[in-house]
UniProtKB/Swiss-Prot annotation:
Functional note: Glycosyltransferase which elongates the O-linked glucose attached to EGF-like repeats in the extracellular domain of Notch proteins by catalyzing the addition of xylose.
Molecular-function GO term, any one: UDP-xylosyltransferase activity
The protein's name in its UniProt record: Glucoside xylosyltransferase 1
Organism: Homo sapiens (Human)
Pfam entry (one): Glyco_transf_8
EC supergroup of this enzyme: transferase
Length: 440
């Protein structure tokens, strides 16, 4: 009996010693695996990467299974795995560089939402017109907007008050800038064509941190999301730096091809009321010109152009842009007339085929047509958007009253095709309410 008791005691003692030895080995391995204690999974991964991905987790300078006798052949010198502790490690997986699954592996990489940069220049009595344009941009756009508003000092307070009242929308930010021209020739630039109009020429030099920008005149109305014209930037080839629409579709009524006394782009010139720019490329490019054999950068070419052509230009900064792209046609992307639809496209009969087929995307009420009775179809759209508020019910009810007003204009050439004025607008309203609340 005593013999059996001794055997039992001896077995228990051996088992206890074996257990102690196992725990001590486990503690040592854990200390080595965390680089001496206190390590995190991120630190382990960093250590592994710092060691060139070669077994650095187990200790600095250790390279692969050769340094670990007894390690299975499946432990390659580049082995790395992640192990969920609720499951046993698979038999064919090397455990040398194996980490527990951790939350950091599943952390979401949230990409910052791209902002669309929109610039406008407002002087004189252009406050209300500009605010209506900005409202049309906000109502239908999807991505956030960043407004760059260049205005005379006396308009800043009014702009700030009106825009701050819209801050509840949280879909846009804005920055107000003074009107600034190069000091040496400020007076000459300011009186070119219309007050402050030539400010747009200097946007690439002023907004140095902005990569791309959509410039629009104050008399622009967006009938579909700004996102859509912004997406045209992706269609630029490697040489294109800006995009505009033709000045005319029909050469028989074109201005540049009949009256211009300076070079102009293409057959009928381009209109700069809607101008999409990759300003990074504009700042880098060296432009061909007819003043010197040396190519000039944007900031160096503007004043020489004005000095050479100031007696021959009629439309100011737009004429200078036409001259630039006459000499550098490969740098311009031309988009269809429906992106810059003006009275000239319908007052002599419809001559914008793209608008007839797909509707008007951007309405450009130049010639002051929003404020007189010469083109009542244009004025009807302007008044509808000016009086529209941001409440959902008001936007939903925008179309029917507008269509009734447009039907009263059928005695004019533009009114006869009034349906193209609401075709895209109706789609934009439908799309707005089809989007989820987070997208609005």
């Amino acid at each position: 009996m005593r013999r059996y008791l001794r055997v039992v005691v001896l077995c228990v003692a051996c088992g206890f010693c074996s257990l102690l030895y196992a725990f001590s080995q486990l503690a040592v391995s854990l200390e080595e695996g965390t680089g001496g204690g206190g390590g995190k999974p991120q630190a382990a991964v960093a250590s592994w990467l710092a060691g060139g991905g070669r077994g650095a987790v187990r200790g600095a300078g250790v390279a692969g299974p050769a340094a670990h006798p007894g390690v299975s052949d499946r432990c390659k010198d580049f082995s790395l795995c992640y192990w969920n502790p609720y499951w046993m490690l698979p038999s064919d997986v090397c455990g040398m560089n194996c980490f527990w699954e951790a939350a950091f592996r599943y952390s979401l990489k949230i990409q910052p939402v791209e902002k669309m940069h929109l610039a406008v220049v407002a002087c004189g009595e252009r406050l209300e017109e500009t605010m209506t344009m900005l409202k049309s941009a906000i109502i239908f756009s999807i991505k956030p907007l960043q407004f760059h508003i260049f205005a005379e000092d006396q308009l800043h307070h009014s702009f700030k008050g009106r825009l701050d009242n819209w801050s509840f929308l949280q879909t846009f930010n804005y920055t107000l800038y003074p009107i600034t021209f190069p000091s040496e020739n400020a007076a000459e630039w300011k009186k070119l064509f219309k007050p402050c109009a030539s400010q747009r020429l200097f946007l690439p030099l002023i907004l140095k941190e902005v990569d791309s920008l959509l410039y629009v005149d104050t008399d622009i109305l967006f009938l579909r999301p700004v996102d859509d014209i912004w997406s045209l930037l992706k269609k630029f080839n490697s040489t294109q730096i800006a995009a505009m629409a033709p000045e005319h579709e029909e050469p028989r009524i074109g201005w540049y091809n009949r009256f211009a006394r300076h070079p102009y782009y293409g057959k009928t010139g381009v209109n700069s009321g809607v101008m999409l720019m990759n300003m990074t490329r504009m700042r880098r490019k060296y432009f061909k010109n007819d003043m010197t054999t040396v190519r000039l950068q944007w900031g160096d070419i503007l004043m020489p152009l004005l000095k050479k052509y100031k007696l021959n230009i009629t439309w100011g900064d737009q004429d200078l842009l036409n001259i630039v792209f006459f000499h550098n046609p490969e740098s311009l992307f031309v988009f269809p007339c429906q992106w810059n639809y003006r009275p000239d496209h319908c007052i002599y009969g419809s001559n914008c085929q793209e608008a007839e087929e797909g509707g008007i995307f951007i309405l450009h009420g130049n010639r002051g047509v929003y404020h007189d009775d010469k083109q009542p179809a244009f004025r009807a759209v302007y008044e509808a958007l000016r009086n529209c508020s941001f409440e959902d019910d008001n936007i939903r009810s925008l179309l029917k009253p507008l269509e009734l007003e447009l039907q009263k204009t059928v005695h004019t050439y533009c009114g006869k095709i009034y349906k193209i004025f609401i075709k895209q607008l109706a789609k934009s309203v439908r799309d707005r309410y089809a989007r989820s609340p987070k997208e609005k």
